Amino acid sequence: MSENLILISGSKEEQYSSLLPQIKSLVEGETDLIANLANVTAALKEAFRFFWVGFYLVKENELVLAPFQGPIACTRIRKGRGVCGTAWQEKQTLIVPDVDAFPGHIACSSLSRSEIVVPLLKDGEVWGVLDIDS
């Protein structure tokens, strides 16, 4: 496992291309989901200096906060509520350039201005979401 990230200063695409194999190396051989999610959030936050990055995991009818990096976050989000709950319900990645313009946005922090939420699927079902705020 690599303990230090090699960060490059290129285009966003070049930065992501450089980071992906490093993240794969971080999680390779580790079977604990929480440990892997924690390392992924740390790597993304360090590489891109996002305001907040973390995971929510599906527990019955809501998303429950999982490993994250950043300020204190909302602990539970219902399906269809906010950007995370909507991405879960629609099984679609949502890119929101202005969170104030998103109907029903949940403001965990007024400092967050934009958000990307990526649903994580297995066998066609969402088991969690990756949430990134800038």
Go through each PLM region and give its residues.
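Regulatory sensory and allosteric helical modules in signal-transduction proteins
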Residues: 58-108
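Short coil/loop residues immediately preceding or within conserved phosphate-binding loops
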Residues: 50, 115, 127
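Short beta-strand-to-loop transition segments that serve as allosteric relay/switch motifs
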Residues: 129-134
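Intrinsically disordered, low-complexity terminal regulatory regions
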Residues: 1-67
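A short, aliphatic-rich beta-strand micro-motif
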Residues: 114-121
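Short loop/turn motifs at secondary-structure junctions and domain boundaries
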Residues: 47, 107-112
